[in-house]
Regions:
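Central antiparallel beta-sheet cores of small beta-barrel/beta-sandwich binding domains
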Residues: 18-113
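Beta-sheet ligand-binding and adhesion/scaffold domains
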Residues: 1, 76-161
């Protein structure tokens, strides 16, 4: 199985999956659980730099698109930046997945609504079948507000579907 420690082979093609954004129980009165479909398209620009185009299609009809720029800065570390990710983050690679260093993301409650600076803790793990599972714990001013789970994500490899 190809692992994240082989970034040129691992981070490629189109990834697809489903997930949900699950607000903290105390917030569910105002914010319902939001299922979504996820796709990610990776385009390599050089031997060490690539773009990641993420798309989230929520059941409510809302569509969220973002582009990240990624650079391999060490054999086991990638640095990523995006317009909604002030300061970016590092991705630490290991054989069974990868995790982001804690990062800030800018998120709006509703389309065109107020933008909040959210602290995110993001971990991705590979299961034995080669599918990726991503869990993002989201905080606002130190308080937990939501957890986003994506997976299983089909990495588009032969035999993984």
């Amino acid at each position: 199985m190809i692992t994240p420690l082989q970034p040129r082979e691992f981070f490629r093609g189109v990834w697809r999956g489903e997930g949900e954004l699950r607000p903290h129980p105390l917030l569910r009165i105002f914010l319902p659980v939001q299922p979504f479909r996820f796709s990610c398209n990776v385009t390599w620009l050089s031997d060490s730099i690539w773009t990641v185009d993420d798309r989230f299609d929520f059941a409510s009809g809302r569509v969220l698109k973002r582009r990240m720029f990624a650079e391999l800065v060490a054999p086991d570390r990638i640095h990523v930046t995006a317009d909604d990710m002030p300061g970016g983050a590092d991705i630490l690679l290991h054989e069974r997945g990868f995790r982001f260093t804690p990062y800030y993301a800018l998120g709006a409650h509703r389309e065109g609504g107020r933008v909040y600076r959210l602290r995110c803790f993001d971990e991705c793990t590979l299961d034995d079948r080669g599918f990726l599972h991503d869990t993002i714990r989201i905080y606002y001013r130190g308080l937990p507000v939501a957890t986003m789970r994506i997976g299983p994500v089909d990495l588009g490899r032969d035999g993984a579907a």
